[in-house]
Amino acid sequence: MKNKPDDRRDNVDKIQYNITKTIQNCELADEMIAKTDDEKTKKTLIEKNERRREALDGMREEIKDEARDKKNGYM
C-alpha cells in the first residue's frame, strides 16, 4: 500500500470552515439555552459550548501555525 503524500495546501481553509461551523453551533446552542426551561438541557448545552470555545482557541492557534507554514512553503 502506497502512502499518500502530506498535502497541507487546504488546511487553512478546512480549519476556517471548522471554526465557522463551531461558532454557528455555539450560537444555536445559546438560542436553545434562552428558549428552554429544562435545566438539564441548559446545563448540557452550556457545558458543550464551553468545550466548543476551548476547541475554538485550539483551532485559532492551529490556523495561525498553518498560515505561517503556508507562507513559508511548508518547510
UniProtKB/Swiss-Prot annotation:
Which Pfam families does the UniProt record give? Tlp
Q: Where is this region: Disordered?
A: 53-75
Give the family this protein belongs to, as stated in its UniProt record: Belongs to the Tlp family.
**HAMAP family on file:** Tlp
Query: NCBIfam families from the entry?
Result: SASP_tlp
Identification of the protein by name: Protein Tlp homolog
Protein species of origin? Clostridium botulinum (strain Hall / ATCC 3502 / NCTC 13319 / Type A)
